[in-house]
Design a protein with these regions (language model features):
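Extreme N-terminal signal-anchor transmembrane helix of membrane signaling/transducer proteins, especially
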Residues: 3-38, 42, 46
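Short, conserved clusters of charged catalytic residues that mark active-site
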Residues: 10, 14, 54, 86-90, ...
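Generic alpha-helical secondary structure signal
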Residues: 22, 43, 47, 61, ...
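Short, positively charged
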Residues: 44-46, 158-164, 191, 195-203
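Extracellular/periplasmic ligand-binding regions of membrane signal-transduction receptors
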Residues: 49, 53, 60-97, 101, ...
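Short beta-turn/strand-loop junction motif enriched in small, turn-promoting residues
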Residues: 57, 168-170, 185
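Extracellular/periplasmic ligand-sensing ectodomains of membrane signal-transduction proteins
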Residues: 96-162, 167-176
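Conserved beta-strands of PAS-like sensory domains
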Residues: 174-204
Length: 204
């Protein structure tokens, strides 16, 4: 017996089939979208995490270079304590030979060199003039630069251990946003007589 299907039934069946196919297609697309979005998000997080790790490793390496530079220079500073004016050449060489260090100084305790006045802090720093880098020199300390009250001096002096300062704007010294690595210098009795510093710029 020959079956008979009306045109309407065929149309209706086609609609059902197409609707089912469309639903399946939409479900597949939604699953694919969710998977893709999740994958893209995970990839972005992994990339950001990797970038952060690389940056942290690079910064850590640079900070270690700054620390090592000062520690390796302590002996020559101690050797020249009897001639304070010669410290200028030492500080200038530190800044000139290390591109990470924009300024370096030695902040002596008040009246360490009585002939130099109450405060004495020789300080060398670099400035850019066009494409040329110039090393300048200052003697800091006084009412306009009361360094014994500054964190980079006071904290390592009290703790008798090296210290990285929080970022700050240095007026009178570097005149820029910087962080300072401070290394206490002690005499044979273990008393701090100066704070040896290296500044890194956070705005270059």
């Amino acid at each position: 017996m020959k079956a008979f299907f009306s045109p309407w039934f065929a149309t209706k069946l086609s609609i059902y089939v197409l609707s089912f196919t469309l639903i399946v297609f939409v479900c597949i697309m939604m699953l694919f979208y969710n998977y893709s979005r999740k994958q893209i998000t995970e990839d972005a997080i992994d990339h950001a995490h990797g970038l952060l790790q690389n940056t942290a490793t690079q910064i850590s390496g640079e900070l270690q270079i700054v620390e090592a530079t000062l520690k390796q220079s302590v002996w020559i500073v101690e050797k020249n304590l009897s001639t304070p004016d010669s410290l200028r050449d030492i500080l200038t060489a530190i800044v000139k030979n290390n591109s990470l260090i924009v300024g370096s100084g030695i902040a002596f305790i008040p009246e360490y060199y009585k002939e130099k006045g109450k405060y004495f802090m020789p300080y060398a720093f670099s400035i850019n003039e066009g494409e040329e880098e110039i090393i300048n020199f200052l003697k800091l300390g006084g009412a306009d630069y009361d360094y014994p009250c500054m964190d980079w001096y006071l904290i390592p002096k009290l703790l008798k251990k090296s210290y990285w300062s929080e970022p700050y704007y240095d007026t009178g010294g570097g005149n820029t946003i910087m962080s300072t690595y401070s290394l206490p210098l002690c005499n044979q009795q273990g008393e701090v007589y100066a704070i040896f510093t290296a500044n890194i710029s956070l705005s270059r």
